[in-house]
Amino acid sequence: MEVELLKKYGSVRPGEIENLDGTTETVDFRFSTAIRFYHNMEDADFPLHWHAPGEIISPIEGTYTVTIAGKTVTLQPHDVLIIASGELHSIRAPKTGERYIMNYSVSYFHQIQDMAELFNTFYPFRLVTRQEDPELADQLFAVLVQIEGEYFSTNVYRESEIMALMLHFFSIFGRYEHRQNSEQVLDYPKQQDHMRRFAELCAYINNHCTERLSVEIWPPARGLVSTIFRACSRKTRA
């Protein structure tokens, strides 16, 4: 019964966010995976909230309106919206329609350097529209369909298959971005190096979060931390 409620409504309590404290949502990953997947058919709106996991939204039928970072985006069928970790957003649903909504553990995928670097480009959100990028949108949507099939199945090695599909989803997006920005990557090597080192720093902190940390312990962090503090100081003075 719980699986059917999750599949139909995206919640075991239709019409509300399950674990919401003020504007903070705690995502309950189910079935021992690092994702929470909804095939949502509700006409209920979701108030302003945020959560540590990232989020992917893609309408199947009808539109879906998301307000994030001061912008309101109306998604059309097979558009794909990626919302970065920690971003405040609200959702307005139409009277009818269906859509995929998926939360994913950022820390789980941050263990892979490629993914950590890619996730740094998601802030505050990334939008792929079928009108502007039909091939990319269709590829990403097809992977979401496969994830749904595994998530609500009883297949053995389901978790492994879901994680493989998630990596495939992000790899498709990342390779597309790399092709689109290849000239920019060559023009701005310093920024790319900072992004790579920042991803390494995030991964190091994630892997040693129970230890006493300092920049002296991990020398590569020294220059990067100084760069970040200088940038923050300039913004503060401005």
Q: What is the role of each PLM region?
A:
Residues 178, 200, 204-238:
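Basic/polar phosphate-binding segments, predominantly the helix-turn-helix DNA-binding elements
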Residues 2-36, 88-152, 171-184:
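A hydrophobic/aromatic-rich effector-binding and dimerization subdomain
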Residues 60, 141-155, 202, 206-209:
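Regular secondary-structure segments
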Residues 31-123, 153-160:
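N-terminal regulatory/effector-sensing and dimerization cores
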Residues 136, 154-162, 194, 211:
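Residue-level recognition of alpha-helical structural elements
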Residues 136-139, 190-201, 237:
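N-terminal positioning helix adjacent to the helix-turn-helix/winged-helix DNA-binding module
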